[in-house]
């Protein structure tokens, strides 16, 4: 039985390859579940992975982050709300939504496949749903390292531009 019940939504006109999103995100969640806080432990989880165009992600970015421009990935974590309301341990714990802009991912996929970029961004989004953030260089390096590990776990090459960032030690500058 899968640990994660994933809903994948295609809300863009771009044709995307059929990738095993359910399997990959389930494997990533299975990998990291032992590290989750005790009150985030559940027998199963739910999440949504939505692929959109730049207009939709720009609207979301404007509405929720007050940034009126497209971005590559947004994550709307539900765990804090779910835990505050209490949850039935017999029911799946809803993690939230990961929204990825396919056109922005395509622009970023210079020197590697769009599929690789989309997998990289989905790993990043899932980490945000699980409480990870990157307000400083050290936490960004930890997050990028985890993303690299997850891509290796599902045999997807790490985007070349990220390899440089992962291998760089965190800056000591403020």
From Swiss-Prot:
EC number: 3.1.-.-
Source taxon at top rank: Bacteria
Binding site for Zn(2+): 124, 128, 134
GO molecular function, one term: RNA endonuclease activity
Keywords associated with the record: Cytoplasm, Endonuclease, Hydrolase, Metal-binding, Nuclease, Ribosome biogenesis, rRNA processing, Zinc
Cofactor(s) it depends on: Zn(2+)
Subcellular location field: Cytoplasm
InterPro entries associated with the record: MetalPrtase_cat_dom_sf_prd, YbeY, YbeY_CS
Cofactor note: Binds 1 zinc ion.
Keyword Zinc assigned: yes
Signal peptide: none
GO annotation (BP), single: rRNA processing
Stored PROSITE patterns: UPF0054
GO cellular component entries: cytoplasm
Protein family membership: Belongs to the endoribonuclease YbeY family.
Entry-linked NCBIfam families: rRNA maturation RNase YbeY
Chain's role: Single strand-specific metallo-endoribonuclease involved in late-stage 70S ribosome quality control and in maturation of the 3' terminus of the 16S rRNA.
PANTHER family: ENDORIBONUCLEASE YBEY, CHLOROPLASTIC
Protein's name according to its UniProt entry: Endoribonuclease YbeY
Lineage of the species this protein comes from: Bacteria, Bacillati, Cyanobacteriota, Cyanophyceae, Synechococcales
